[in-house]
From Swiss-Prot:
It comes from the Bacteria. It holds the Pfam family SelO. The keyword Transferase applies. It is an enzyme of class 2 (transferase). InterPro entries: SelO. ATP binds at residues 94, 96-97, 117, 129-130, 180, 187, 266. This is Protein nucleotidyltransferase YdiU. The gene is ydiU. It catalyses: L-seryl-[protein] + ATP = 3-O-(5'-adenylyl)-L-seryl-[protein] + diphosphate; L-threonyl-[protein] + ATP = 3-O-(5'-adenylyl)-L-threonyl-[protein] + diphosphate; L-tyrosyl-[protein] + ATP = O-(5'-adenylyl)-L-tyrosyl-[protein] + diphosphate; L-histidyl-[protein] + UTP = N(tele)-(5'-uridylyl)-L-histidyl-[protein] + diphosphate. Its cofactor is Mg(2+); Mn(2+). Mg(2+) binds at residues 257, 266. The active site is at 256 (proton acceptor). Belongs to the SELO family. Its EC number is 2.7.7.-, 2.7.7.108.
Length: 490
């Protein structure tokens, strides 16, 4: 490991331990400088948590770092190699438009990845220009920070700079670079690459590094790789349940977009569900609904099976025994996910301890929500506030009957109604990043007006507040978002 130098006025303290891994797993690559970088968004609270002094980050030297025009002391820029399944088909991938600057060592001693997204071509660009447009980078900033507010594990967004250069997509767009922050950028697809093209020693080096980076409490285990598989399965079961509980649809659950850390990563074609429907899809490229809302849990399990396959040489010396171990661990995912989801759903209804009939109560509500095309978020907000709008659901006899059963269930528990209501407020967001609100913010920002985006971010950072200033953001769009489509921006 290199000697770490601190740039005292800003707090940068960079290292790159990933670059100590076998050279097959990455390529050294500097960002491509841009013409006229301008800082347009800075996440000051995140900067401070990383040990950076936000007041200095607006100066030209630091804007140059965010743009890739300057390499900070301690940084060793690399593009990471990975290969995985995109819509079920295996491809050679890798960071085609992203550069890992290194790991910022925080005041608490954590190592946090600092990556530039849209920073130019790399050996993995596969014909792409390596650049990003302003809209998609701001979109990732908004949604990732909304997920942080929702208390869902996620990569974060530190800054967005415009480049002063155009990006050619269907139209000519403003170029931009996002500074993404993550526990790491190690993916299922990273392991797939190592298993496909690396040696067993290189695969083992990656696994050992991952364990040290994310599961450092493992000590003296006979086989730490079984524990690695178990922990990744547990984290993904928890993560996907949290997505489902708030109606988040990732949109592109390829294996390169499943982080070993258990954080949500890559916010290209994601969106939040309005009307409750398991078949909801927003991504323009997901024509078959592979990554629909209802398919997210089984797709996560499928991705984890691909991860388990990569670990087979490490799980046991005997291949058949390795397969048996992997299958046994994978078989636990469905129950782990369901337990997390059910625990979250009863909390959304103000129920503290599970009873056998609770699942039927939940499924009954969801079925009538689907029948009456009810808004997912606002239905639970109405239950929380005990204020029922003119939503068709609330006028139905089915809802009246369900409401009686729910009240009877609440009356059977020993906790007070006040405690139950507080549990609901902590479990049901009052606001989510409504698709039309995000589009409004992006449209204004592309015209140079960031006030709409900043107001939206302020509300989204505390979605459980149930405050008056949030009320306008819980409103539904005037027109249905059923035809709303999202794009990955590449």
């Amino acid at each position: 490991m290199q000697d770490i130098k601190i740039k005292s006025e800003t707090g940068w303290k960079l290292d790159n331990t990933y670059a100590d891994l076998p050279k097959t797993l990455f390529s050294k690559q500097n960002p491509t400088p841009v013409k006229a970088p301008k800082l347009v968004v800075l996440n000051q609270p995140l900067a401070e948590s990383l040990g950076l002094k936000a007041e200095f980050l607006h100066d030209s030297d630091n804007v140059a770092i965010f743009a890739g025009n300057k390499i900070e002391e301690g940084s060793l820029p690399i593009a990471q190699a990975y290969a995985g399944h995109q819509f079920g088909y295996f491809n050679m991938l890798g960071d085609g438009r992203a550069i890992l600057l290194g790991e910022q060592i925080t005041p608490s001693g954590e190592k946090i990845d600092i990556q530039l997204k849209g920073s130019g071509r790399t050996p993995y660009s596969r014909g792409g220009d390596g650049r990003a447009a302003l809209g998609p980078m701001l979109r990732e900033y908004i949604i990732s920070e909304a997920m942080q507010g929702l208390e869902i594990p996620t990569t974060r967004s530190l800054a967005v700079v415009t480049t002063g250069e155009p990006v050619i997509r269907e139209n000519v767009l403003s170029g931009a670079i996002l500074t993404r922050v993550a526990s790491s950028h190690i993916r299922v697809a990273t392991f797939q690459y190592a298993a496909k093209w690396g040696t067993i020693e290189e695969l083992k080096a990656l696994a050992d590094y991952t364990i040290k980076r994310h599961f450092s409490d493992i000590d003296n285990l006979e086989n730490p790789y079984i524990f690695l598989l178990q922990e990744v399965i547990k984290r993904q079961a928890s993560l996907i349940s949290k997505w489902q509980l708030v109606g988040f649809i990732h949109g592109v659950m390829n294996t390169d977009n499943m982080a070993i850390s258990g954080e949500t990563i890559d916010y290209g074609p994601c969106a939040f569900m309005d009307t409750y429907d398991l078949e909801t899809v927003f991504s323009s490229i997901d024509r078959e609904g592979r990554y629909s809302y209802g398919n997210q849990p089984p797709i996560a399990e499928w991705n984890l099976a691909r991860f388990a396959e990569t670990l087979l040489p490490l799980l046991h010396n005997n291949h058949e025994k390795s397969v048996e171990i992997a299958q046994n661990e994978l078989s636990k995912f469905a129950d782990l996910y369901h337990d997390n989801w059910l625990r979250g759903m009863i909390s959304k209804l103000g129920i503290f301890n599970k009873e056998s009939q609770d699942e039927a109560l939940i499924e009954n509500l969801l079925s009538i929500m689907y029948k009456y095309k009810a808004d997912y978020t606002n239905t639970f907000s109405a239950l929380t506030l005990d204020k029922y709008s003119d939503m068709e659901l609330f006028k139905s006899k089915e809802f009246d009957k369900w409401h009686e059963l729910w009240n009877a269930r609440l009356n059977r528990q020993k906790e007070s109604k006040e405690s139950s209501n507080m549990l609901m407020k902590n479990s049901n967001p009052y606001v989510i990043p409504r698709n039309y609100r995000v589009e409004e913010a992006l449209a204004a920002a592309e015209e140079g007006d960031y006030t709409v985006m900043n107001k939206l971010l302020h509300v989204l950072c505390n979605p459980y507040a149930y405050s008056d200033n949030q009320s306008e953001y819980e409103k539904l769009p005037q027109k249905s978002c059923g035809s709303y489509r999202t794009y990955c921006g590449t």
